A protein has these predicted regions:
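Short amphipathic, charge-patterned alpha-helical segments
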Residues: 108-112, 259-276
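Gly-rich Lys/Arg/Thr-decorated short loops/hinges at beta-loop-alpha junctions or inter-strand turns
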Residues: 21-27, 83-94, 197-202, 244-249
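Ferredoxin-type iron-sulfur electron-transfer modules in oxidoreductases and energy-metabolism complexes
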Residues: 29-46, 76-78, 84, 93-98, ...
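Conserved phosphate/anionic-ligand binding catalytic regions in large, soluble enzymes, centered on
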Residues: 47-68, 112, 169-181, 185, ...
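Hydrophobic alpha-helical positions that pack around
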Residues: 133-259, 271
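Histidine-anchored nucleotide/phosphate-binding helix
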Residues: 101-115
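Short acidic, glycine/serine/threonine-rich loops at helix termini
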Residues: 57, 62-65, 91-94, 133-138, ...
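Cofactor-/ligand-binding subdomain signature composed of acidic, glycine-rich
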Residues: 1-45
Length: 424
């Protein structure tokens, strides 16, 4: 099994210095792209690979790039932004690359920027990732010194400047247009689309925003080809995937596995199964803003299409496991509390609706719920769903709540009829 994304990770997590990274094959994709490929060739190769965005939405990466205006009449400067604002609860896969192999992200950004002929790039980093910040700054400086960044890179005539921007620490900055507003020094609220960032993004110029893991895949696709990348997978969704697991399992962590590895294999073979004395009840498969899956779904492949067919989303591919000694009502209340705090307040349903939902869940968890509260929550959740809010924050926030009421309804009812939390 090939693991291109994690092959350079070292014991102890210390990243390779640039010369050792080059010895291991690093920056070969930059030399290949700038030396023997046209920008459109890089985009077409990524298109043929069928690489999908690894930040949650799963949009085809090459197709996204193709929307950027090209040619002599294209507006400049163009921008490439690496979304490293990994704020989704339960998600920590990108941190592994940011801390352990920063040059892989820089190389991915250079090749991707060349494909769209970007002039400037930004790594938009989560505020709490201090170790990643230190290592990225060092790696960027090394890349400049080696001639991979700056003016006339490797004598190609193409120039690319790269900057590290540390977020102020808001979940909303993970939404690409909220991120762009933050980069511009504005309040991190989402923008109306269209126009899309590919046409009018950062400071009104063409901009691509890609996830850390997405960008880290690009050099390997350029070096090895689209067919190779498609062959890494066990499913129609191509490549490998960084899967993460948290919760009461024996070995929580992150693993690079073929896309389409089943939920059961990830949980049992890699995460080591449940801790002694605990039983599996459910799992949120792709970060906190995705629907629960339960035991009947354990043999489903963890890929975009299969998880969607099961009624959830692959999202970030990092799972939060629910065991039989953890209260599902308390777990969902904790998530809704987070989302209510992180609402940007731009639209009324999200600003008012999420705190109201969190308040009602707290009452149920504290044994103060009333008959009819569940029907009220269900009805209210639909009003926070797709088509009712300005962006996807609120619809994502109510996904774990809606699925918890579907799969664990008896637990909610016991809180109301017993006037107490059975787990306390």
């Amino acid at each position: 099994m090939e693991t291109p994304l994690t092959k350079n990770l070292q014991p102890g997590g210390i990243p390779l210095p640039i010369r050792e990274f080059e010895t291991a094959g690093g920056y070969q994709a930059v030399r290949k792209a700038l030396g023997s490929m046209k920008p459109e060739d890089v985009t077409e190769t990524v298109k043929q690979s069928t690489l999908q965005g690894r930040g949650g939405a799963g949009f085809p990466t090459g197709l996204k790039w193709s929307f950027v205006p090209m040619g002599e009449q294209a507006p400049h400067p163009k921008y490439l932004v690496c979304n490293a604002d990994e704020m989704e609860p339960g998600t920590f896969k990108d941190r592994v690359l940011l801390e352990g192999d920063p040059h892989s992200i820089i190389e991915g950004m250079i090749v991707s920027a060349y494909a769209i002929q970007a002039d400037v790039g930004y790594v938009f980093l989560r505020w709490e990732y201090r170790l990643a910040e230190e290592r990225l700054r060092r790696a960027i400086a090394e890349a400049y010194q080696a001639g991979y960044l700056g003016k006339n890179i490797l004598g190609s005539g193409w120039s690319f400047e790269l900057y590290l921007h540390v977020s102020a620490g808001r979940y909303m900055c993970g939404e690409e247009t909220g991120l762009l507003n933050s980069l511009e020094g504005k309040r991190a609220t989402p923008r109306s689309k269209p126009p899309y960032p590919q046409v009018s993004g950062l400071w009104g110029k063409p901009t691509i925003v890609n996830n850390v893991e997405t960008l880290a895949n690009v050099p390997h696709i350029v070096n090895n080809g689209a067919e190779w990348f498609r062959g890494l997978s066990r499913s129609p969704d191509a490549g490998t995937k960084l899967y993460g697991v948290s919760g009461k399992v024996n070995r929580p962590g992150v693993w690079e596995l073929p896309m389409g590895t089943t939920v059961r294999e990830i949980l049992e073979e890699h995460a080591g199964g449940m801790r002694p004395g605990l039983k599996f009840r459910g799992v949120i498969p792709g970060g906190a803003s995705t629907d629960f899956l339960v035991e009947e779904h354990l043999d489903i492949p963890m890929d975009f299409a299969s998880i969607q067919k099961a009624g959830s989303r692959l999202g970030t591919g990092t799972m939060i496991v629910l065991d039989d000694r953890t209260c599902p009502v308390a777990m969902v209340h904790n998530l809704e509390h987070f989302f209510a705090q992180e609402s940007c307040g731009w639209c009324t349903p999200c600003r008012e609706g999420l705190p109201w939902t969190e308040k009602l869940l707290k009452a149920i968890e504290d044994g103060q719920g009333d008959e009819g509260d569940l029907e009220l929550l269900e009805r209210h959740s639909k009003l926070l769903g797709p088509g009712h809010t300005f962006c996807a924050l609120a619809p994502g926030a109510v996904e774990p709540l809606q699925s918890a009421m579907r799969y664990f309804r008896e637990d909610f009812e016991r809180h109301i009829t017993g006037k107490r939390c059975p787990w306390r």
